[in-house]
Amino acid sequence: MTIRSLAKKIIAYTIEDEYKVYRLRKTKLRIRIRFTGKYHKCFDHETICPNKIVFDNYMGNGYGCNPKYVLKRLLEMPEKMTEGLDLVWITKTPELLRPILPARVRIVLYDSEQAFYEYATAKLWVKNFQMVHLLNQGLLKKPEQVYIQMWHGSFGIKKIEGDCGYLNADKAWLALAKKNAAYTDFWISNSRFETEVYKRAFWGAGKILEYGHPRNDLFFEQDQLQYKRKVQEAYGIAPEKKLFFYMPTFRDQDHGLLQPLPYEKIAEALEMRFGGEWVCLVRLHPRRVSREQIEALKEQAVMDATMYPDVQELLAAADAMVTDYSSAIFDFMLTKRPGFILAEDYDAYEQVRGFYYPLTDTPFPLAKTDAELLEQIRIFD
């Protein structure tokens, strides 16, 4: 048992208004700490910069998803239309993004005091995740600020936020998640289905705009091969090789190492069915990334694409894809290339997290074992 899990057994933690409340279980002893105090002290006096926009992709992970493609479009516009805009990208890896982003985009380290200053003074927040972690550190939204939530999912397979029973059992998380939802001014949806999910999962989400996801614009560009060339160059893959992309999601209650697939057998099955020589790329979910997991991937017959900045480019480059419960496969569907679902823990995952619909209702061949996946590849029609 870890120290953290032991502490949870002894101490109950929740949120009450602007206070963290720690209670020793089975006693009346309570400690209340105003978690917004530091933020009030440091940033309440700061004025809003009307031309500042802060972008953040999934808690500072890479340069991708919907925030990237909004920023990309701004940078493509005539300079006279965007002159004076202060564009800020928040990231955990500034050193990786400096060669990618133009000089006019300021890069700020995620979770730093500078990042909180940027949030405090920006007119517009463009994000694709719940800011529970930042709110837990005291982040506050001022009335004159605008928060656009673009989300990172698609036609969600797994249940999210308010639709997920076990998440709602965490009272501290629930209080901050509801606060995040109340802060949000606009939600960007890709469909009626997603709109209905937003309304339920985000506690009566406010103004929902069915504009589609900006990140999927790249699938409709004329030169689709540019992304394959870019990925092949990044990983030293020969131009004639085909790319198989494995993108598993996380497990809420399992932080162990990702079970490897029979990658060599998968490559053989793909070669038998579709021809060509295949290379396997694996991308870990940000919540599964660890030093041990990265080291484990090095020992397998795969390319580790976890740190590649933009997953959409990987999707555009791939010739075939496998996931378990990541809705990214619906984005990949826009390529009209073969996609497969490998759900080895289907029943357990459904019980803990839950699905919005049976996976058999999707257009993707479903396998529950490695052997079934190999067979689904061989008979793919």
Task: Give the residues covered by each predicted segment.
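Short, conserved loop/helix-junction motifs that constitute active-site signature segments
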Residues: 138-144, 179-183, 271-275, 335, ...
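Extended catalytic core of nucleotide-activated donor transferases of GT-like folds
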Residues: 68-72, 77, 101-170
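Conserved catalytic-core segment of nucleotide-activated headgroup transferases in glycan assembly
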Residues: 63-76, 201, 213-295, 367-369
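Donor nucleotide-activated moiety binding/catalytic core segment of transferases
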Residues: 107-122, 286-330
